[in-house]
Amino acid sequence: MAQHLAAVYSQIYGLTLDVSILTFVDPAHINWKTVTKNTEKINKIYLQIMPLLHNQNNIESTSLSVELQHLLHNLKIVLETFSAHLSDYNMYFENIHSLSAPCSRHKSIVFQFYNNCCVSVKMCIINDIEIFSKRLSSVFYCIRSCDALRGINHVIDFLGHLRGVSPIPLPDTYLSNIPCIYCLNEHMMLPNQGESLPSLMMCVNCKHVCKQLNPEPIQGMFENELLQRHIIVESNKQKEQNQTCSIDNQIRDASLSKLNQHTIFENISAPVLELSNLIYWSSGAHKKCANVENTSEMAKLLSYEAKMQNYRKYICKNSTHFFDKYKPYPIESIFCGGIFSSVDDTVKSLKSDCSLAFMKRANYQQLIKKQNELFVRLNKILQGEDTVSHAASAVPLSDKATIVNPDQVLHDAHARKDAYLQKVTKDGLKSLYTCLETQGAVLSNTLSMRVWGGAVYDEIVKLKNHFLFRDQFISLDWIHCETDSVTGFENSKYIKNLIYSQKLSSEHISSLTLQFYKLITGPLSQNVSFFPLPSNIALAHCLDAAGALPHHKLLLTEMIWPSIEPKDWVSQTYNKFYTITSTDLNSIQKEAWFFIRELVLSVSLYNEVLEKNLLVFSALNFEKNCVNLSPNQFCSGIYLTYEDSSPLIFVYENQGWVFKDLYALLYHHLQLSGKNHGT
């Protein structure tokens, strides 16, 4: 079934890519007969597949099925919009892209937690959905499954609205500097070197929510298209290559005239040999040399775009596509790129202009000219100076002070100044190179094209499946025990009295603390790898991903301490397990911790006192849907459902019971295990 679903997805994905391109094409050049045929086919596929996808996603969702449902729905709407606005060419693009309509990418969804605690979640970009998923995962035990599913379905609908039909999300619908949960997991695998998590996440470039694509060469593709149609494109490259530096030309010509006086029959003098070597080794720089133009590289790129636009008239006259009618301003084209150039070309042009502006500064030009060894040595040779430095005559130390004059002092000062400026120049060039590389990477990450990633769909599907499985599990054929029976109350009191005088060993407390942490770790942070993380680390990842404040972690660590006694956790109420009475979310969360702590510690003490082996499971352990399952397909033990109506489900030997009181459940287990032991 998954293979068939993937095959349908690949075909629909390819069609949505073509349709997304059609939304920018001149409608006069679209074959509307083909569009009409494809619309009819999509309508048939929609009627056949959409109900099945809807049913599947309400039983057990997958990121593939949810995204396919979105693509089919959006594709049908876009094709219908094509047909509706085909006749109005003047308003075609405005209607297709809803340019005059108010922004529809804002959503406010209300989630109702226990005890009618309502929280409004506002969303406008893709990252908001990912952030919401992490936060709901950290408080999954504070909400009923039915209420969570109602809100999650609204979130998925909003995600489908943002998804559209194009594989490329709109640039204003995501931010690449907001880390997702996968970015967090990757950074957790690396040593933090003493830095906090927020500082590590400051310079993150998320590639999971929207995948970054490597830039591809675009320049030259349109020229090849023109050449195939025998249209010659004028190029200025040959002119640029023939331009050379005038100073280097003069030096080269003068050097060659000096060497013309030397013949093969003469002995080679040191100046002649050095002059010949310098001309030889500087030949590469001579070929690359070009006059510095006043036009920047960015201006050249923009003029290249305009030039290629003029050549479009040779292919199709009177063509008006979306970018002809809505042209970006020059400053906007830096961020959106061009039709005939890539973002990589834009980044290279900006780096080149920054470097050129730095090098044009007068002090750097002068110092770089002085540092050019070839230039200095050639000038000395052409001026007739001897290249071999003569050793200065030895002067007694006592006579040095007498021959020092003010001119030499000034000369030394200028020499020190030049040395200092050369050092500053060297450091400045190094800093310039580092800055260009760093900012170039930032520009590439910001401006490069990205496509939809799978992170958001994976996270929202995991959350939805968790609440689906919870709802399915409590809806199975369980036996509901009487809620307010006198016998149940006495049984509960018996177990409480039994364990109240006992105490857990301090060695046992540490393992129980990890079990408690595991039961409150969200479904997005559950470790199913071959090398799972410890429960405390997994919970820390869950809270860090949700952005929990430090004092929340402190409160968690204070839930269980080494000297804890039954009087500290045993509730005095009857039949009120997981009955939340708080009205704000923080208090609801803490109250849920108390109930889960009571379950872990009481069951452990019960096993220790009565030598039982009763296990505790949770709804987090379900890896597939629970539809049409029976009690005999579950392991024996206590299942924590996090639902206030059916918080505890006790499965024992092919039967299952729903309890609202933990100690009545333990007494029931004591009876069943005693009978089996007696037989």
Swiss-Prot record:
Record keywords, A-Z: ATP-binding, Host nucleus, Late protein, Metal-binding, Nucleotide-binding, Viral genome packaging, Viral release from host cell, Zinc, Zinc-finger
Pfam families, sorted: PRTP
Zn-finger (C3H1-type) residues: 180-208
InterPro entries named in the record: UL28/UL56
GO cellular component entries: host cell nucleus
Domain of life: Viruses
Subcellular location: Host nucleus
One term of GO molecular function: ATP binding
One record GO biological process: viral DNA genome packaging
Description of how the protein assembles with itself and partners: Associates with TRM2 and TRM3 to form the tripartite terminase complex. Interacts with portal protein.
Purpose of the protein: Component of the molecular motor that translocates viral genomic DNA in empty capsid during DNA packaging. Forms a tripartite terminase complex together with TRM2 and TRM3 in the host cytoplasm. Once the complex reaches the host nucleus, it interacts with the capsid portal vertex. This portal forms a ring in which genomic DNA is translocated into the capsid. TRM1 carries an endonuclease activity that plays an important role for the cleavage of concatemeric viral DNA into unit length genomes.
Family assignment from sequence similarity: Belongs to the herpesviridae TRM1 protein family.
Protein name: Tripartite terminase subunit 1
